Structures are given as C-alpha cells and as structure tokens.
Regions:
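Internal mixed-charge
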Residues: 1-12, 27-42, 82-211
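A generic structural signal for short coil/turn motifs at secondary-structure boundaries
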Residues: 19-22, 121-123
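Intrinsic-disorder/low-complexity loop/linker signature
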Residues: 20, 56-58, 81, 159
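N-terminal interaction modules that seed assembly of large macromolecular complexes
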Residues: 22-60
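A generic structural signal for short, non-catalytic loop/turn and secondary-structure boundary residues
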Residues: 45, 56, 65-68, 93, ...
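Surface-exposed ligand/attachment interfaces on beta-rich extracellular proteins
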Residues: 50-67, 121-129, 157
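Solvent-exposed beta-hairpin/edge-strand motifs
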Residues: 62-81
Length: 211
C-alpha cells in the first residue's frame, strides 16, 4: 500500500470521500500518516544492515550515512567468521567506536546491524501488510481529533455535536493504536539472540548513576 492508497483508505474511514467538499486536504492527511508511521517505527522499526569500512589505526566509524537511524543493534567485526564475531561498541552522535583491543587496519569491512524508520511514500512502503490497518486507524484518529478541535463552536452541517463524535472516534482509534504498539512493539517481543550490547546501557528515570 503506497501513500496514495493509504490516503484513500483514510478518507473512506473518515467518510470524507466528496472530492468537492473535503474536510481534510491531502497535505493534512499526509501529515497525520507521517506522524503515525514515525511513532510506529519507534516501536516496530525496520531492520537493516550496512557495511562500513575501517580507517587505518582507528576504531571509529562514521554512521552519518545511516539515514533515519533508530538504534544500533549489533556490530560484526571481523566479518565472514562463523560463528559471527560481534564486538562491543559505543555511540556518540554520528560516531560508532568499536571497543576492541587492537586497532583495525584500513579498508576492513564492518557489518552494522541497525533499525531505521519505515517509509510510506508515493511509490512504496516498508510497512508490513498486517499493520496497514493499524497505521490507517491511528492516522484517522489524529485527523479526527484535530478536526474536532477546529470544529468546536463552529456551525457544522452534521449538527452542533458532530465535533464531539469525531473527538470520541479519534480518541478510540488512538487508544487502539497504543494498545497495538504495546502488544507488538519490540520491547515486548521475545527475541532469541546473542549479540553484544553497547558499552553502557542508556539511562532512564529508574537508573541512578553515581560516582
């Protein structure tokens, strides 16, 4: 399903199919779709692999070329061994540092396993088909909630409470979206793997890092 097909699906769900009297412009719907895809990507990102090349005498690798990066998952070095040889690493801004004893020679391959944002554009989509309904529902929810805010205290053809109906419908769709993310998101998925983690776990509100 490409962007145009998703937009059409959205208009059907929102009962906004009268081209002469659209409630939402294409640009507005595209914005809600883009927001939904980004939020979906943070919970269920697209898995990818890139091959980077070492510089002589340096453990650092630039990851600036990894567009729409969500997270680095693992670093394989040297490549081509069996079992695969994963190394510890640290990341700061656009630099990945392999935490290895000896410095690499120049021109060696390093496989970086990472996750990235999904794409949904005019020609293609990386959203798994089974989640297209999830994207459509949430994007419709955002559109309905936004329109209800705009329509409050305005005269509407559907009646004075039509904004409230859209608000309720939109909130229900967004609640469904959050439940789907919680159910299918990577944090709740059982992933059997043995990869080396980053050098330090990211801090959160439950982590105390003292001297």
């Amino acid at each position: 399903m490409d962007l145009s097909e998703m937009r059409t699906r959205l208009r059907t769900d929102l009962h906004d199919e009268d081209a002469a009297n659209y409630r939402w412009t294409d640009a507005e719907l595209d914005r809600h779709i883009d927001r939904t895809v980004r939020e979906f990507s943070l919970a269920l990102p697209l898995e990818a692999t890139a091959t980077l090349t070492t510089a002589a005498g340096s453990r650092d690798l630039s990851i600036a070329s990894l567009s729409d990066l969500v997270a680095i998952e693992a670093v394989e070095y040297p490549v081509g061994e069996y079992p695969l040889s994963f190394v510890r690493y640290s990341v700061w801004l656009n630099t990945l540092t392999m935490l290895i004893e000896s410095t690499p020679s120049g021109g060696e391959d390093v496989s970086v396993y990472y996750t990235t944002l999904h794409t949904l554009d005019v020609s293609s989509s990386t959203i798994p088909p089974r989640f297209e309904d999830v994207i459509a529902g949430a994007a419709g929810g955002y559109a309905a909630v936004e329109w209800s805010s705009f329509a409050t205290n305005r005269v509407n053809v559907g009646g004075q409470d039509v904004w409230r109906d859209y608000l309720t419908w939109g909130r229900e769709r967004l609640a469904d979206f959050q439940r789907d993310l919680a159910k299918h998101g990577r944090r709740n998925a059982v992933r059997v793997r043995r990869l080396y983690p980053p050098a330090a776990a990211p801090a959160d509100q439950s982590t105390v890092q003292g001297p």
